[in-house]
Amino acid sequence: MAVIVIADKNTGKTYKKEIDQNVIGLLTGRRIGDEIDGSFFEMPGYKLKITGGSANNGFPMKKDLPIAGKKRILITYTHGRKGKNGIRKRVTLRGNIVGSDISQLNMIITQYGPQPLEKPEEQKGEQ
């Protein structure tokens, strides 16, 4: 079971959906920055852009690492933080190609569809 996290820039909210591994299989080979049709995730009319993710073992995806697996690389800054001058660190990161071992995939909405993502909530007090 994999999770996609969809960020909505207009409202500032994020939405989480659980998807099957066969849907991740359809996305295999896509890269960070690719646009995907929302019909993969029961969101017709929406266009989504892949912005990142993480593998089953927790390693984050790195945009400028063009491989499908994980790799230990030597970098001058840690992923997501600014480092100190002169210090290099060896870290394990996952490449930017989506594979079957993805557990979380982060996306943003680039084109909106006819139906809103947020479902109206029922009030408990009134019947």
Curated annotation (Swiss-Prot):
Keywords: Ribonucleoprotein, Ribosomal protein. One of its GO terms (biological process) is translation. One of its GO terms (cellular component) is ribonucleoprotein complex. It comes from the Archaea. The keyword Ribosomal protein applies. One of its GO terms (molecular function) is structural constituent of ribosome. Pfam families: Ribosomal_S6e (PF01092). InterPro entries: Ribosomal_eS6, Ribosomal_eS6_arc. Belongs to the eukaryotic ribosomal protein eS6 family. HAMAP family: Ribosomal_eS6. This is Small ribosomal subunit protein eS6.
